[in-house]
A protein has these predicted regions:
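Adenosine-phosphate binding glycine-rich loop
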Residues: 2-47, 54-57, 390-392, 400, ...
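Short amphipathic alpha-helical segments
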Residues: 45, 49, 359-362
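Anion-binding alpha/beta catalytic cores of soluble intermediary-metabolism enzymes, centered on
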Residues: 58-65, 70-343, 347-417
Length: 417
């Protein structure tokens, strides 16, 4: 147990500890040489060490054969890890991919990349100046010895900048791109990093801590592009609540979608829910219920529902409806017995615009800070490009990295067929 505690003190400190003590980047040293009482790792690591000692001394009667499973069960009992998170991480560990982290010099992203590497989730590639990254890593007591660092502005990357620029200029020639303009853009982390994925030098890309979403969205459209069968792409957040898991879209991309864009969002949402091995039961939301208000947004939602039901007659989807009717099966069945969702628990909520979707998930997050939220999960781009935001924690980024890894693996399998 003593050795386990000593080892923990030298490892990167979880965000929850920094938050509780109102400090940034707590590291081993004169002011921190034993883990803080709130450190969630104490239960799993010290308990495992005590159990091992008990086995070695002959005190324990029941041997533990799978120590990782034992730690996972402890984390689940303590609420540190849900079945959803564990399933994502376990799947990613089976098929680790090369993931580019755009803001390699950011302490949060750097810690997330190292954690994802240590957990076997991915092979990280950090973008940034190597000297700066190593200084930050040294301050945080992080080991970057087996992690690739790419400086997109360095002289030795001139060849790749030219290669990526040529591809982008040819791809967007009818949209005003010249080679010179494309080459200049390759000094930017998002253009270079996404081009690495586009050209096969990496499998997935994580960005968003430094960049406005609007700028990142434009780069993604330019470099990666939207899948041919869609007019747009979108994002989804997964909320793991006491009532169950809910999938919410579109939380990031489309501000004022028309009925065609809403239809695309619904299609993408259904596919994404199936990606997580769930059967989608979808409610398309508005302030109106099944035609009670025939003005404004309810009309476009109603048209999108009609298109979805026509194209996918076996899909459980209906609307337009208010969110309370979507979430209350008994209320919905009593008031609207004709609904295609009769007797079903809704798990997928498609909102009529960005303000309502984004506000809804952030409201739930604010009311229940302990709730597990995974996202934003990108839907509809040609490659696995995924986003974070300036408020993302280390665990948030690790979770979205696991999603990106699975996304990349599934994409490879599809391309092999």
């Amino acid at each position: 147990a003593v050795h386990a505690i000593a080892d923990l003190a030298k490892q990167p400190v979880p965000d929850v500890v920094n938050d509780v003590y109102h400090v940034n980047d707590l590291t081993f040293g004169p002011k921190y040489f034993i883990p803080k009482p709130v450190d969630p790792r104490l239960i799993t690591e010290v308990s495992a060490a005590v159990a091992k000692a008990a086995m070695e001394s002959g005190v324990a009667r029941t041997p533990i054969k799978d120590w990782e499973k034992y730690k996972q069960e402890l984390r689940q009992l303590l609420g540190q890890e849900t079945k959803l998170t564990r399933k994502l991480h376990d799947t990613a560990r089976l098929h680790p991919q090369r993931v580019v982290f755009a803001e390699g010099g950011n302490p949060t992203m750097l810690k997330a990349a190292v954690q994802a590497k240590n957990e076997g989730i991915c092979e990280p590639i950090l973008l940034g100046n190597p000297d700066r990254l190593n200084r930050v890593a040294s301050r945080l007591k992080l080991d970057l010895s087996n992690i690739e660092i790419v400086d997109m502005r360095a002289d030795n990357e001139q060849g790749r900048r030219a290669k990526f620029a040529k591809h982008l200029a040819e791809k967007r020639a009818r949209e005003g791109y010249s080679f010179e303009e494309a080459y200049d853009k390759m000094y930017e982390r998002n253009y270079f990093g996404m081009s690495m994925v586009e050209q096969g030098d990496a499998d997935a890309f994580i960005t968003g801590l430094y960049t406005k979403y609007s700028n990142t969205i434009k780069v993604a459209k330019d470099v990666i592009g939207i899948r041919d069968e869609y007019k747009t792409f979108g994002t989804m957040h997964i909320l793991n609540t006491q009532k169950g898991v809910y999938y919410i879209a579109d939380t990031l991309i489309n501000r004022h979608p028309d009925e065609d864009v809403l239809t695309d969002i619904a299609k993408l949402s259904a596919g994404t829910v199936k990606f997580f091995n769930e059967e989608p039961v979808m409610a398309m939301l508005s302030y109106s219920n099944f035609g009670t208000d025939a003005i404004g947004s309810p009309i476009k939602v109603k048209k999108a529902v009609a298109e979805m039901q026509k194209e996918f007659p076996d899909l459980a989807i209906d609307g337009e409806m208010q969110v309370n009717y979507a979430l209350n099966k008994d209320l919905r069945d009593e008031k609207y017995p004709f609904s295609r969702l009769k007797g079903k628990d809704v798990n997928t909520l498609v909102f009529p615009n960005l303000s309502s979707a984004n506000g809804a998930y952030k409201l739930l997050q604010g009311l229940n800070p302990e709730a597990e939220i995974i996202g934003p999960i990108q839907m509809g781009l040609n490659k696995p490009i995924h986003f974070t935001d300036s408020e993302s924690s280390v665990q948030d980024i690790v979770n979205i990295t696991a999603v990106a890894v699975i996304d990349a693996y599934v994409e490879k399998i599809k391309n092999q067929k």
